[in-house]
Amino acid sequence: MRPWGSIKLDIYGGSHEKRMGLTMELPKGLRLDGEIISRDIERRRGVNKKGVTSRREADVPIYISGVRGGVTTGDTLRVEFENSDFRPKDYTDISSLPRPSHCDYPAYIKYGGIPSGGGIFSGRMTLPLVFAGAVARQLLMQRGMTVGGHYYDIGGALDSPFHPLQVDRHTLDRLRGSDFPVLDVSARRAMEDRIGEAAERGDSVGGSVELCALGLPVGTGGPLWEGLESSIASIMYAVPGVKGVEFGAGFRMADMHGSDANDGIRIKDGKIAFESNNSGGINGGMANGAPVLLRVAFRPTPSITQPQHTVNLRELQNARITVGGRHDSCIALRGLAAAEAALCLGILNCMEGL
């Protein structure tokens, strides 16, 4: 697998392997903030949250190289995590039955077998991604940038959206410290009900999260594939389960006129200001100074206990499958931490002078 981006991020291992990890290139002299890293890892774990897998791992980073005394040395940073609470036997009975809408069938054709527990395609692999994103978050914070987000839509239960132009750092910090990050606290009950109802039926629900980045210097990004949207989307789609990314008004723009979609520019208090933010803070692939806003859609967890149609790949016959094991009823819950990590990495990839 080719490394990603200017930091040459690489992730390796698998859900049911003893270890998995990452490598990335970082500047010399960065003091890694253990509290920031631990908080983001803990948010991804989602312990005691309704709809989250019962699999429990320590998720403690093991530093192999590239850091000494908590400070980066300038050499390649390599960090690993141990896996201990995995159960390959849960997949023995379905080793030749591809789970619908999972990686199993294309992986079987490409690699010659169905990877246990999803292998490197598993949501478990968001752990090293979240670690990398936490490091990226620190580098962005040093440059005055803040990233945060909230659950926007869980199974059709909606939270209030961010105001397109009036998002503040305090709100983003509050959301990051919440055990259930929503802007409207009354949305939590409805969201948890949707998750619980699906879980009782052996089913799952999809969801979306809304993300915001503040403080990006105007011009961050570039043309074509060097654009800010290109960078963010490319790493966002590396998060397992992500099926859609839209910036600003996104797909709603297809129903707009230019006179409605365009963000007027004015002078306010001696500074450039925008009358709206349908572009999500990005024009021409570059940050324009408004809040960078995007929404990320997660598919419903494909591993469900309801009987489904599949095929037996060894016998080439139609079959039915019931997926056991331990799985999230809504991957968007833990996916928020992974999406924030991807946003941090996508922005960092566009920063010059690292």
Where are these regions (language model features)?
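Generic N-terminal targeting/processing segments that precede catalytic cores or assembly contacts
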Residues: 1-354
